[in-house]
């Protein structure tokens, strides 16, 4: 099998969520954070030819980048991974899947309580401003008939009362109130346009960011509130 640049970019993103991954035959890949706060899945254009566990995905991708774009990836007779182009061959150790954390099955996200969207340029601004202003927490909330993302530094503002950044997403004509709080450490998502789905039921809250190719389900912080 061969991995395209698009697939490699997705795998690099997944490696930021979990350094290990279990690849299964087909065109669907998924991962989750070791602490369970983030789940990600993608439909890729390439076909995974064999099941294999990788303990250090980043290092595997680094080695892959050192051979030609035409390199063929296959399962060697000893159970390890063979990466070969016309002149060179690299053998990469496969992992025992018991040594990595991976999702057993795709997450079925519940029917959303609120659906909105965030454009690629707005997401890029949010991530850049967050780094520049040391924003470690964001809250997706409704205010004055709008759905808004507010950014905070929770270390200096534990009550999340003084936003350092605010971004209006869209109008909101619902009757429910919500304040979905996300740790920015869990916002490891690829650039792009996303449908944002918010769900709450009692003390359970989650958000799903869905693009045409990649989706992420992110757990909310305990101080999230809603009246759904």
Swiss-Prot record:
Molecular-function GO terms, alphabetical: DNA polymerase processivity factor activity
Function description: Sliding clamp that encircles the genomic DNA and links the DNA polymerase to the template to control the processivity of DNA synthesis. Responsible for tethering the catalytic subunit of DNA polymerase to DNA during high-speed replication. Interaction with the sliding-clamp-loader opens the sliding clamp so that it can be loaded around the DNA template. During transcription, encircles the DNA and tethers host RNA polymerase (RNAP) to it.
Domain of life: Viruses
Protein name: Sliding clamp
Disulfide partners: none
InterPro entries associated with the record: DNA_clamp_sf (IPR046938), DNA_pol_proc_fac (IPR004190), Sliding_clamp_C (IPR015200), Sliding_clamp_T4 (IPR046389)
Family: Belongs to the Tevenvirinae sliding clamp family.
Species of provenance: Escherichia phage RB69 (Bacteriophage RB69)
Entry keywords, A to Z: DNA replication, Viral DNA replication, Viral transcription
Gene: 45
Gene Ontology BP terms: DNA replication; viral DNA genome replication; viral transcription
Complex and partners: Homotrimer. Interacts with the viral DNA polymerase; this interaction constitutes the polymerase holoenzyme. Interacts with the sliding-clamp-loader; this interaction allows the sliding-clamp-loader to open the sliding clamp. Interacts with the viral DNA ligase. Part of the replicase complex that includes the DNA polymerase, the polymerase clamp, the clamp loader complex, the single-stranded DNA binding protein, the primase, the helicase and the helicase assembly factor. Interacts with the viral RNA polymerase (RNAP).
Keyword Metal-binding applies: no
């Amino acid at each position: 099998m061969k991995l395209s640049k698009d697939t490699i970019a997705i795998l690099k993103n997944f490696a930021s969520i979990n350094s290990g991954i279990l690849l299964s035959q087909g065109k669907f890949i998924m991962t989750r954070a070791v602490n369970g706060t983030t789940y990600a899945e993608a439909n890729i254009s390439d076909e995974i030819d064999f099941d294999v566990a990788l303990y250090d995905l980043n290092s595997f991708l680094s080695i892959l980048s050192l051979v030609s774009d035409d390199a063929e990836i296959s399962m060697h007779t000893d159970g390890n991974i063979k990466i070969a182009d016309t002149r060179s061959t690299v053998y990469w150790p496969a992992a025992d899947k018991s040594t990595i954390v991976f999702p057993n099955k795709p997450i079925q996200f519940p029917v959303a309580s609120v659906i909105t969207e965030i454009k690629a340029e707005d997401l890029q601004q949010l991530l850049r401003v967050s780094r520049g202003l040391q924003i470690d927490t964001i809250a997706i909330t409704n205010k004055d008939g709008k759905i808004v993302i507010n950014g905070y530094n929770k270390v200096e503002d534990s009550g999340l009362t003084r936003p350092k950044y605010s971004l209006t997403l869209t109008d909101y004509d619902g009757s429910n109130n919500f304040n979905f709080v996300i740790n920015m450490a869990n916002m490891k998502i690829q650039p792009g346009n996303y449908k944002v789905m918010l769900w709450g039921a009692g003390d359970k809250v989650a958000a799903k960011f869905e693009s045409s190719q990649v989706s992420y389900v992110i757990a909310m912080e305990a101080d999230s509130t809603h009246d759904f």
